[in-house]
């Protein structure tokens, strides 16, 4: 069937900011789709609110709108651009929900816009829990016994009939938001209340729990001719009951018999045909391990996280082909880009095993509930490929960057029996390590199977790894054992620990017996057809399929799994760096292990190595490729941390030298450099012991900012106000010793300013200066950034440009650097310099039209800024105003405090752009999911130090018609200032308290600043959590509250009676 020529313009809806449950996989899908549609000659219009994505680059679509994905803004774009069709199935849950809203509001009919890929009826049948259940009943496919509920009473009657445990699944939500398994009435009340609030249609499915069944997924494709095929099937190691995004996954499935595989395959194809989906679809099934009984769990009628994993696991580009199918092409007409000879309807065949392990942010959120269930909690994931399950699993473990290079975690090994049992029976993010610890202590695989319902096959494989571990320890430096261990995926670092020698000695042993990995190709067809895919994985076998080309090459290190502090921004920079290397005439090679990202799309680089980012694994690639050098500036802290080890092994680090990187990151060296350059910084010193830290703090005066050196995302950073608090931090948050010093600085509560710059060693280009709305003390990644700076004098800007130029040249930076300053009056202090790409680089690149990672790479490769056409100094500022607003995933992470401070907590970001700051902020807030009410009630409960400032804010809220509620202390201060206020009871008082008002929806905005001390801290935590659970915006910084207020004031009008001159009435604004 030829592609459609009756449509010319297609609107692609992106997925918005990165949140838990919806990460970089949709940047990958959207980028593929836009390029695929342009390839077919269509005019592509894209809307997405996330500036940190490749898909929002101007080259990706004919028109790119970085605007909020809301009914209001998308409708405006449709009316302006008049697309013939929209493609919503590549923008995750956000895209699907937007399409449903546009349809319900009548916009699609009004503007005569067709929905491509999967029609809205099919989306409704898959997403609406009741319609889905009815369809399955029609098809004769079993679903767990269930009921649709819209309130708690309906939930009670279902439980009376079925009994506990039950699973709650809210309709039209992402990553199982609001869902969970309930074992008792208390859990039922909490989960159902939360689920109904989070479902846009106030609907949940309550179903009988089938926890313990095997969970299997099929990634399927179908075209308009009803051709359907399976791209990949995947098996969750964890049984049903743990969200698939939080499960360890293996592809292809390892424990299904042929009969089981074919049974579930047939079901998946039957469902995609019944839904008449044109494109990709994910079917999740539960299989009884003791019979052939199965249940259909759910269907995602769109490209999903699993699609990205299936694409990378097989090499089959699902999103690219789904876009082609959406415009009428069929599977038997489109060539498979991997082989170039076969067509897309050939089902991929795998001659290797793929393991995916999720990455969690619990290192950032120590208070979070780590227990896994049906609501997703992982921020990202890693993937590894091997010839066996054991090899793939161990490669994935060392890709995680959780301080383990093997199935060995100190915490698990040292756990008492009670903790060990709890961690095994009630799964948390680190259960894999506790299973290994239990096997080491002599528990049998049958005992573990009984407790976990994990298939005996996987437990047997784990036990084999532990057995091999024991033989390694018993046979130091034995050649045969070494070879066996390497084939099983053991790392040199772990072997070195076993044999009590250093890692280099292991390498020398391997070199002596020529024991090195070879690289195999991912080709979708298990070598049945000729393939030229430049996509490789390592394994210990005979034949090597990766050959070095005659062209000089450069290796770029990726940033690994997405986590808080190191997100998709670094992947964005990696991809741009690769393109720049290719433009400069070199072969560009990527090493990375994240299946969600654009950088691991094999069509991006000349060669892709899907490998752990460890010294050993990277060195193997370097040895085979012999590159000109390695670029580490764009892979976040992951890549920077490898630079030292690589340089010691004789590898050329391109760009800023290792010594100069160390001068920026090592506190003492940095202080000396600042002294020479005569640039001020807040007073502070390095401490290598608790006593030393107390002395430094006493000398410079409290409050102080304390943090470990060499850190990304403000890990373990805190503002400390007393000696007692400092002692607590030093003993609990960090392991301080001479090797790992702690930095103690005077805390300057000024205005924070951030600068990204590019230096060629002589000239320095500053694309822009961004100011933060929140004052210093809130992590830069969690602050609202504004460009161009609105509150800085010309003198301060000149000082910042001068300091930035001096720092870049004085530290011999070649490439990118990011500097954070704090401005106090007209004084400018340097807080820190990062000699690498930053998380603001994509934002600044988009708005200044200076492709920073691209330019920096050209400079790293030896060109200079003037020859590249750039004038040194500050680039001319744009007329429009741009804001970068952080986005948080607090709703997914219960028991995490939402208060902002020096430790980063946001998972993503959005951009707002307009002609005034207020309009740009409005777009930013709306895009981030903040509900902007033009009237309502503001609840104020602030610390004593903030009360004076809160009076001014309350006056302004009152002036535009808001009612003010406050707790006793804050209310007294407001009454003294003659501001109308209703006093509410604190938590623990007998009558109706402020928590009741929040729960009953009587509050529209909460402003709550941190009080130090135990009780108020606990109360504040509960206020903030209740606000998040009930979807109420909560500001823990008065600066954020003021920004929201500015927006509300700009949307209100003056109202004054005509006879105001007779009796002076106060003005009211609405």
Curated annotation (Swiss-Prot):
Mg(2+) 1 binds at residues 284, 298. PROSITE patterns: ATP_GRASP, CPSASE_1, CPSASE_2, MGS. ATP 2 binds at residues 707, 746, 748, 752, 777-780, 820, 832. Mg(2+) 2 binds at residues 298, 300. Residues 1-401 are annotated as: Carboxyphosphate synthetic domain. It is an enzyme of class 6 (ligase). Residues 930-1070 are annotated as: Allosteric domain. Pathway: Amino-acid biosynthesis; L-arginine biosynthesis; carbamoyl phosphate from bicarbonate: step 1/1; Pyrimidine metabolism; UMP biosynthesis via de novo pathway; (S)-dihydroorotate from bicarbonate: step 1/3. Mn(2+) 1 binds at residues 284, 298. Residues 547-929 are annotated as: Carbamoyl phosphate synthetic domain. ATP 1 binds at residues 129, 169, 175-176, 208, 210, 215, 241-243, 284, 298. One of its GO terms (cellular component) is cytoplasm. Mn(2+) 4 binds at residues 832, 834. Mn(2+) 2 binds at residues 298, 300. This is Carbamoyl phosphate synthase large chain. Signal peptide: none annotated. InterPro entries: ATP-grasp (IPR011761), ATP_grasp_subdomain_1 (IPR013815), CarbamoylP_synth_lsu (IPR006275), CarbamoylP_synth_lsu_oligo (IPR005480), CarbamoylP_synth_lsu_oligo_sf (IPR036897), CbamoylP_synth_lsu-like_ATP-bd (IPR005479), CbamoylP_synth_lsu_CPSase_dom (IPR005483), MGS-like_dom (IPR011607). Keywords: Amino-acid biosynthesis, Arginine biosynthesis, ATP-binding, Ligase, Magnesium, Manganese, Metal-binding, Nucleotide-binding, Pyrimidine biosynthesis, Repeat. PANTHER family: CARBAMOYL-PHOSPHATE SYNTHASE [AMMONIA], MITOCHONDRIAL (PTHR11405:SF53), CARBAMOYLTRANSFERASE FAMILY MEMBER (PTHR11405). Mg(2+) 3 binds at residues 820, 832. Belongs to the CarB family. GO terms for biological process: 'de novo' UMP biosynthetic process; glutamine metabolic process; L-arginine biosynthetic process. GO terms for molecular function: ATP binding; carbamoyl-phosphate synthase (ammonia) activity; carbamoyl-phosphate synthase (glutamine-hydrolyzing) activity; metal ion binding.
